[in-house]
């Protein structure tokens, strides 16, 4: 049995690595950062070589052992015939592909696309990026022979294998999510060669998953039960499903889970902790200071509301042009009020996703919360109250990397399956109960997007 199981998460800001033992105890961690490029408004790119160098750096500082991978979803890496990268990767938060997303829905048919893939063709997804390259960089497009997603490029550099897991492939809009295979029908409609696509496997076979599936596994969600709530740069509410189902309006994402024969639905808001980072910079203060000032305000901050659409939105409003706003400002409001309203606004956005998951049949009685935003004690209390769910924190705070390490253990035979890995390695350390009634505030929040959309569009 290996002494260590290693998980690597190829994130938007850097690679995070963790090594654990067979009981889930953290032996070592490592991080390595890299830059994000925004060459034009709405664009978001990174150099795949930066991911590889960061992964090498982390692996050099971790004990040796089987390696599992997680990473940012939807990003497009294009390789030529010799396996070299042809251009910077286009990331999940890139918004340049509105025309191509609409083209996909027209060519496949929106209802058919949702039936096959469980999702609409959103601007951040992978397939619209390919069509954008075909339209805007035809010379480069003609050189493409392989496509990969971010974490799978790192695996390729480490092993030479061109492969992907069903969980991450689900976010390409090229994957038949019910059947857990590439969709020949969608690829034919879009004129995308099937031979460009990496071979797909179950996450437990290849020790890899998209970041949200890996993060959910890392907090113990292998089967239906608690929801996973992630307060990362983006915000996620995630529920495991025992069978494939989908929202005909595709207001939620439905993907394959990292557990075989299990699916998940999730709502994604594009600016959760991202909203906090932005406002902290504007206000010029630290987290503890702002939380303390916000504690002086009652829930609802005397009518101040924040619309958390700083980077467009996905759930429940698939709108890349959505923009954020504060409404209800008065001369009484200070920076503590702004901070609390922002925390509440993000929590309201998470509740949008929870309500849709309930419509799809999820019946959670609690949640597991993770992500950088969970460092704010006040935010934990607000999110629990807005969602109306007790929230639990797990002992491990390593998120997707921890889930990737569990997958490495399953692949290596340390654990019998994902359920065994969760039972042996995931433990909760704290429970936060709801304490405030936010139903009236949420009802007001739901009116914000329709009211703002007309004036907020560029």
Language-model-derived ranges and their functions:
Residues 9, 68-71, 148-151, 220, ...:
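Short beta-strand segments
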Residues 24, 46, 68-71, 90-93, ...:
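Active-site nucleophile and cofactor-binding loops and adjacent substrate-binding regions
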Residues 167-265, 271-274, 288-293, 300, ...:
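ATP-dependent carbohydrate kinase catalytic cores
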Residues 10-12, 114-212, 276, 311, ...:
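Gly/Ser/Thr-rich active-site cleft segment
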Residues 110-120, 432-435:
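Short glycine/proline- and acidic residue-enriched helix-loop micro-motifs
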Residues 1-31, 68-107, 239-252, 256-458:
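Glycine/Thr-rich phosphate-binding loops that ligate phosphate moieties of nucleotide
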Residues 55-66, 137-141, 184-194, 353-365:
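Phosphate/pyrophosphate-binding loops at sites that engage ATP/ADP/AMP, CoA/4′-phosphopantetheine
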């Amino acid at each position: 049995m290996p002494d260590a199981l290693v998980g690597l998460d190829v994130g938007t800001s850097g690679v995070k690595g963790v090594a654990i033992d067979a009981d889930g105890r953290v032996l070592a961690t490592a991080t390595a950062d890299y830059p994000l490029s925004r060459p034009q408004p709405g664009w978001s790119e990174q150099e795949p070589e930066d991911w590889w160098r960061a992964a090498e750096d982390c692996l050099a500082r971790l004990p040796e052992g089987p390696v599992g991978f997680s990473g940012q979803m939807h990003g497009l890496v294009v390789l030529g015939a010799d396996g070299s990268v042809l251009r910077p990767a286009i990331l999940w938060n890139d918004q340049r592909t509105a025309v191509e997303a609409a083209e996909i829905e027209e060519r496949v048919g929106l209802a058919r696309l949702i039936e096959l893939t469980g999702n609409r063709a959103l601007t951040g997804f992978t397939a619209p990026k390919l069509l954008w390259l075909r339209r805007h960089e035809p010379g480069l497009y003609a050189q493409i022979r392989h496509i990969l997603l971010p974490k799978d490029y790192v695996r390729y550099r480490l092993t030479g294998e061109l492969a992907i897991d069903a969980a991450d492939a689900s976010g390409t809009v090229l994957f038949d999510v019910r059947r857990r295979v590439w969709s020949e029908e969608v690829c034919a409609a879009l004129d995308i060669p099937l031979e460009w696509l990496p071979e797909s496997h179950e996450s437990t076979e290849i020790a890899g998953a998209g970041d949200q599936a890996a993060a959910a596994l890392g907090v113990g969600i292998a089967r239906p039960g608690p929801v996973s709530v992630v307060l990362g740069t983006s915000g996620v509410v995630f529920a495991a499903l025992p069978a494939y189902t989908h929202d005909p309006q595709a207001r939620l994402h439905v993907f394959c889970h990292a557990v075989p024969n299990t699916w998940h639905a999730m709502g994604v808001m594009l600016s959760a902790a991202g909203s906090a980072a932005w406002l902290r910079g504007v206000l010029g203060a630290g987290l503890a200071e702002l939380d303390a000032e916000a504690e002086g305000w009652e829930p609802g901050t005397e009518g101040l509301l924040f619309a958390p659409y700083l980077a467009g939105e996905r759930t429940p409003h698939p709108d890349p042009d959505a923009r954020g706003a504060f409404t209800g400002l008065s001369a009484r409001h200070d920076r503590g009020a702004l901070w609390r309203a922002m925390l509440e606004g993000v929590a309201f956005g998470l509740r949008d996703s929870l309500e849709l998951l309930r419509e799809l049949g999820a019946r959670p009685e609690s949640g597991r919360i993770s992500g950088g935003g969970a460092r704010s004690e006040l935010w934990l209390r607000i999110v629990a109250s807005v969602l109306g769910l007790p929230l639990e924190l797990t002992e491990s705070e390593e998120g997707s990397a921890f889930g990737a390490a569990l997958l490495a253990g399953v692949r290596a035979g340390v654990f019998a399956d994902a359920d065994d890995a969760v039972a042996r390695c995931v433990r909760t350390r704290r429970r936060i109960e709801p304490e405030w009634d936010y139903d009236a505030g949420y009802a007001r929040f739901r009116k914000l997007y329709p009211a703002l959309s007309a004036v907020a569009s560029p």
